[in-house]
Curated annotation (Swiss-Prot):
One of its GO terms (cellular component) is integrator complex. It comes from Mus musculus (Mouse). The lineage of its organism: Eukaryota, Metazoa, Chordata, Craniata, Vertebrata. This is Integrator complex subunit 13. Residues 649-694 are annotated as: Cleavage module binding motif (CMBM). Its main location: nucleus. A motif (Nuclear localization signal (NLS)) lies at residues 572-582. The keyword Translocase does not apply. Belongs to the Integrator subunit 13 family. Residues 564-648 have a biased composition (Basic and acidic residues). One of its GO terms (biological process) is centrosome localization.
Amino acid sequence: MKIFSESHKTVFVVDHCPYMAESCRQHVEFDMLVKNRTQGIIPLAPISKSLWTCSVESSMEYCRIMYDIFPFKKLVNFIVSDSGAHVLNSWTQEDQNLQELMAALATVGPPNPRADPECCSILHGLVAAVETLCKITEYQHEARTLLMENAERVGNRGRIICITNAKSDSHVRMLEDCVQETIHEHNKLAANSDHLMQIQKCELVLIHTYPVGEDSLVSDRPKKELSPVLTSEVHSVRAGRHLATKLNVLVQQHFDLASTTITNIPMKEEQHANTSANYDVELLHHKDAHVDFLRSGDSHSGSSSREGPFKETVTLKWCTPRTNSIELHYCTGAYRISPVDVNSRPSSCLTNFLLNGRSVLLEQPRKSGSKVISHMLSSHGGEIFLHVLSSSRSILEDPPSISEGCGGRVTDYRITDFGEFMRENRLTPFLDPRYKIDASLEIPLERAKDQLEKHTRYWPMIISQTTIFNMQAVVPLAGVIVKESLTEEDVLNCQKTIYNLVDMERKNDPLPVSTVGTRGKGPKRDEQYRIMWNELETLVRAHISNSEKHQRVLECLMACRSKPPEEEERKKRGRKREDREDKSEQAGKEHGTEKARPDADRLKGILERGKEELAEAEVIKDSPDSPEPPNKKPLVETDETPHMEKSKGPVSLLSLWSNRINTANSRKHQEFAGRLNSVNNRAELYQHLKEENGEEVGLTGGPRTAIPFLKCPRSPVVNRMETTENGKASRQ
């Protein structure tokens, strides 16, 4: 649909009644530039402009800015109202320039203060303004011709800016009612005409101007909708520079303009040709020139002397101009500019400098860091443009290194998985139409976006951020859970994957956990599995809204995560045992700074671990998942412990492990009596044989001898032998 906004047509209605000839009472020094006055000469008295002159100058400044920035498709029609309406130009492009308007205003001349005020009225101009808005412009006619049968789609909107001296608020309401009734009548006429267009939207801007020093009889009022077609706003402004400032603000509002102040412009002084001073020049342009670096938060705004909400201006610093016009800059946009104070010396110097083929680079002022060149001023075909330069990476530059991202090193990224991800989500031509469940046509591009969204709901980029995507056992589940719908076979495969993970946890299989950037051995095995289950649950929950079968997969996962109490007890004991082993290893490594523990404490710890192992074995035996152990003979414990030499220094890891093995073996059988009572590994045989007189003798009647105790493998036969009362060895 072709729409012409309110900015396409602007009608100025300026009051030419006798009271507009009154002075604005803002004095201007006439000969203030004369530096060397001859003594005895009386200076010229200051002058003041009339309300008419202030209104014409302000409206011409409005038109100048608009023509500078929008030379096409933004049209102005000028009407002077006194005893009748005088239309000074038309909507044709040939009449849209300041020279035509100023020549027409010169023929009108200033208002006659001696004319009859009763014969003059601003209503004549407002009625003529509505009539002018109904006329078709060249651009509207071209659009209607192109659309042909859809010509009614071309919109007709406009804006009326009326500068007058109202008597009161009731007078303002009367003017608004007049415009509303006139629009209603002319829309009826335009409906039956091929050369007129109905007004769809009209903005009425009433500006009440009065001399400086007087009280205003009209109050300001923001924009208000009077009807579906007409909106109105009222501004009460003092004449002189205040009126010029108000219209400067309005032109920014009406055409979406923004302000940029160029600072530190070096210019040579007239009085001192060898020195230079820095000046500032304020420029107006379309606000899109600030969009890019306003989003990045790099803008530095400063307040100017203007009033109203548009007093903010973006400050840019002058850089050394580049004289090489062949050098290319990566430019993202170019916008026409218009100086705010076009007649000032700094503005004139800057304009001439640019029109002579020079370019100026502009940088953002920063307190620290390197400078950022964000804009450039240059002329093309006699018109000056503000170019927006890209301060970020250019598509012409090399892409950023992957090491600058969140992963750091290149090897930290899941590059292989990402290649597979791109292969699964590549775009291909799709010619055959497909339909959704609700019988609506499925757009291939939207379907591709939807699939990409599903695949990226949970997709870690770095290897160290994931566990399940590093496990081959999880591939069957991770590959199908992203589907829009699952089959029964898919659900079965997901359940098998979950059961395999449960079996891995029961067997205490290691997981592929990355230890990059961590010290020590990393998290415990129990903690690794807890992280794995949490991540798997996150992946499944991200897709449970796809279908009901996705919910079944989640239910299976949650059911397998809930472990029986005996399993939790076994894991708890295992964690305690690992903690004690870690402490023992740490004590062995730090033997240079710590003393060895007493022998009794070490033996006590070994015995406690042995008891816990036995208790854990009983728990495993009672577990329904554990196999039945083979039948063994009951073990007999002894209350005696083998004599161990007391350590005289730090205890090594080998000593701790040997003591633990020896202690565990000593609990599994009854020690041979000879070894228990041996002295220096020598056992005396037949200790209980005595003569009748109490002397000890051997088997041959001679003195008893000591037989060295041989270190031989223990066997059930040897271990179960003992002496009897009559001195003969018996086997049990």
